[in-house]
Design a protein with these regions (language model features):
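Beta-sheet-dominated interaction scaffolds and their linkers
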Residues: 22-56, 89, 147-160
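Short, acidic/polar linear motifs in exposed loop/turn regions
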Residues: 54-57, 108, 172
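Short, solvent-exposed loop/turn segments enriched in Ser/Thr/Gly
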Residues: 41-48, 98-100, 110-118, 158-165, ...
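Terminal connector regions
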Residues: 109-138
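C-terminal motif of bacterial Sec signal peptides marking the signal peptidase cleavage site
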Residues: 15-17
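Surface-exposed binding patches on compact interaction domains or structured appendages
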Residues: 22, 26-33, 56-102
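Feature marking well-ordered beta-strand scaffolds used for ligand recognition
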Residues: 225-533
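Extracytoplasmic soluble-region selector
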Residues: 29, 92-95, 125-127, 139-228
Length: 533
């Protein structure tokens, strides 16, 4: 897994290294297959299929390429498209399967008959599996009425979600609500429309919003305006370096920064198995002068990795995590921050439940939420910091809980291949599952909940292309993915949302920090909407 150098970057977001191996790639010997191997949709336009890696090695990244539909004689049908969601998998584990939703987009004037399209799984730009999709277009009973687009802007801004409405009248001229209106954008590369008439523009310039009923259409010509997102650049204003250890996590409170360490680093600055310096130390920095951070103290613990550090909201208490402790007990250490530049150890919480290691934590009130390696969530009462006790637990299934984020009485669990799990922790001693969303092929690594917007931003650390996904949780009982941000070359890591300004800061491994405009309703592919700052 890729790692940052040991330099500590005093910025809003610092990417934290996590353990793992790079996915194996390459077309030779790939054993990907679709189920079914051929599909007849009949007159439907969508279906769920599976892709399976039947081999012994992980495979990725996998691109799912659709394309135009072929009509009689094999000629492509203009305005047609077979698409897949998700359109890519950073990694498909050996023996694993993932669901894929395929959708057909067809021009409104397509003739009745039989048609065919192919979905190809590509690895290293070579075909690894092909699914043949057959479907038919029936003779449509003619609709003798009219459809008229009645509202919606003709100058939508790129990336803004606009709502369009249409009026349908039957052959007698009476308004009817018994017909289903189908919405689309022409050309399809110009934007995305959903079934309710919500449209988001991708490409600035001329386009059309189309409403269709039974072969009768109305088109509204629109001009998609460039988004004009703010532009800028990051400027390094200060740096503090520790050359003997790798830096893991970073947390700031007031004018103090706290940084963790991980792994084993040898004298040449390389990752080592033994014989080097372990990641067993928390460093404390005075950043009251950001251009000249000063290392003021450190705290050593029994660990190979101090992966996470969190500070209580009032700044009085710190929590650091243990992984790879020599006594095999691991757990967490609580710190007294009466003098924030010189923490004092209060106690260490160990338990047989924690021996595998604690990867991440969150402090909320008198409780600490612990993401325990391989065994889910533990909730500890720290109302008496000298005598913390574990009060509750939760496990989301046969997967790895990587991170936990708590806000407004809710805990958001980044539960790897079990997806995002939302818990009601109004009573921290009795957590209750509210809902979950499992995104096929997506290993949920981290989450940020933005209550005012009603969104959760999810990261996946598995490979390239890296994908951040946006989940709408305005109905907490029914989370649904509504948008994504895909950037090739590296996976994302940790996020921080400036909610006042509507800017997301996304750590993206060697691609640095990505600043993205996340204002307004979010829908579709954000990387096509001129939102990257």
């Amino acid at each position: 897994m890729m790692r940052f150098r040991s330099a500590i970057f005093l910025a809003m977001v610092v990417a934290t290294g996590c353990g793992g191996d790079d996915p194996l790639t390459g077309p030779g010997g790939l054993t990907l297959s679709f189920t079914p191997v051929a599909l007849d949709l009949g007159t439907t336009r969508s279906a769920t299929i599976q892709i399976t890696n039947t081999g012994a090695a992980d495979v990725g990244p996998i691109e799912l390429a659709g394309g135009q539909v072929a009509g009689p004689g094999g000629l492509p049908i203009a305005g047609s498209q077979l698409s897949a969601t998700p359109s890519q998998f950073p990694t498909l584990r050996a023996g694993a399967s993932a669901d894929i939703t395929i959708d057909l987009t067809l021009p409104t004037d397509i003739q009745s008959g039989s048609y065919q399209a192919n979905l190809t799984a590509m690895v290293d730009q070579q075909s690894a599996a092909v699914l043949t999709v057959d479907f038919s277009v029936p003779v449509v009973s003619p609709f003798f009425g009219t459809v008229t687009i009645t509202s919606g802007t003709v100058t939508p801004r790129q990336g803004d979600v606009e709502t369009y409405t249409a009026e349908v009248r039957d052959s007698t001229g009476q308004v009817t609500t018994g017909e289903t209106v189908t919405w689309s954008v022409v050309p399809f590369t110009a934007g995305l429309a959903d079934a309710s008439g919500r449209v988001v523009g991708y490409t600035p310039g001329a386009a059309s919003v189309v409403a269709s009923v039974g072969g009768v259409t109305d088109e509204l010509d629109v001009t998609i305006l460039a988004r004009g997102a703010p532009s800028g650049s990051f400027v390094s204003i200060g740096e503090g370096s520790v050359t003997t250890r790798f830096t893991s996590d970073h947390w700031e409170h007031g004018n103090v920064a706290y940084t963790g360490t991980w792994g084993c680093r040898d004298g040449s600055g390389n990752l080592c198995g033994t014989g080097g310096v372990l990641g067993n130390r928390l460093f404390v920095w005075d950043i009251s002068v950001p251009s000249a951070p000063v290392l003021t103290d450190s705290v050593a613990i029994d660990a190979r990795t101090l992966n996470d550090v969190k500070i209580s909201a009032d700044g009085s208490l710190g929590v650091i995590t243990h992984e790879g402790s020599s006594d095999l007990m691991n757990g967490i250490t609580l710190l007294d921050l009466a003098d924030p530049l010189h923490p004092a150890v209060i106690t260490r919480l160990v338990d047989s439940d924690l021996f595998t290691g604690v990867h991440n934590v969150w402090i909320e009130g008198n409780y600490v939420y612990l993401a325990v390696d391989g065994s889910g969530l533990r909730i500890a009462d720290i109302s008496d910091p000298a005598a913390p006790t574990i009060e509750a637990s939760f496990y989301g299934g046969s997967s790895f809980l990587h991170d936990v984020y708590v806000r407004d009485g809710l805990a958001f669990l980044s539960h790897w291949d079990a997806g995002l799990i939302i818990l009601d922790v109004g009573d921290p001693t009795n957590p209750q599952e509210v809902s979950r969303i499992d995104i096929p092929g997506f290993l949920v690594h981290n989450a940020w909940y933005w209550p005012a917007a009603g969104y959760v931003f999810l990261g996946d650390e598995t490979g390239s292309p890296g994908v951040m996904r946006v989940v709408d949780v305005r109905d907490l009982t029914a989370p649904v993915q509504v948008a994504s941000l895909s950037i090739s070359g590296a996976p994302p890591h940790n996020f921080w949302i400036d909610e006042d300004r509507g800017i997301g800061y996304f750590a993206w491994y060697e691609l640095g920090i990505q600043a993205v405009d996340v204002t307004g309703d979010l829908m579709g592919r954000l990387e096509l909407q001129g939102r990257r700052i």
